[in-house]
Amino acid sequence: MSRALMSGRCPGAEALGTATLPGWRFVINPEGFGSIAPRPGARVYGVLWRLTARDLAAINAYESVDAGLYLRRRLMVRQGGRGSSAITYIARWKGEGTPRPGYIALVVDAAHDWKLPEPYVRSLARWAPSGWRGARARDTGELG
């Protein structure tokens, strides 16, 4: 989601704007990185990117698709009231873990940069090791 990281990894990528993924929630996987998991009624906010073939290969390598760390899956996202098929990356390892040092700060900074809804940004910040990870607020879609 970070503009700076995407421009470094995928210089030909074009940001198409923010989008939502209904029926899924943000999680930190056992490896300490972000992923998504199905959850009826939940919603993930993020950024939709148009990638060149070279950028797609670069992001697949970065997400360790060939090694099996993440699985690439097409899901329907919503952007501006319209549905669109998008490639997502889902951690192979199920369950929840603790984020790696600095990871959540990076995610939250990017969420602020993209002006994602503040309740959602707060739900991301709760994943910080010092943050509270109990029941999430209903308005974030995390409570299920």
Language-model-derived ranges and their functions:
Residues 1-144:
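Glycine-aromatic micro-motifs
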